[in-house]
């Protein structure tokens, strides 16, 4: 998804959780989101109240955990709009709980995304304040169940055709993307498949957030292992990188790809993004 599509979906969650008629003249949707294709050690996201800006990192994590982090930062923005400050008090977690319950009800994420998220203190603090997450009262909400995204990858040669059909380029996905109804999606796929290999066409439900991108795994000091690297999809000086064997990988494959390299002694590994 593009940053703008992610932003619009977050705004839909806010509209459901904090309807304008109950919160007139609010500025809850007046923020910017920047998805950083970068791994950080000490935090997954951050909010700058003076700029109304949210940054999200660590795209190697499970998608549902990234969504939970994104809603955490949206919670800080709403908290700041209400109180002119934000912290990790019970007041903040009341806002976060409300956002999470709304997003789960809409199908944007699942309750398992919260239960399995063990790389932050949110789950512990939410249950301390509000009891077992599995016992929360969550109502299903009607949200885009009948809409899909079509994503077209490796499609530079047909980009003009895609633009003419209303597709927008997502630099995060590195794909051309269009939203449409379920009745249109399969027919559209057949049209695009006339121009490009069908394996480069993906259809995904539009009622969730999918935050994904690509990393470039760069391996150097590895002369003794070049045969192994070549067999496993690495290219010498690939993708414009210099003096390294390079493999383009989905961001959420980073940990598993790094694990495969552990058996190669003395190599140097760098993770790059474009």
Annotated model-derived regions:
Residues 51-70, 84:
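Short pre-active-site segment immediately N-terminal to the catalytic Zn-binding motif
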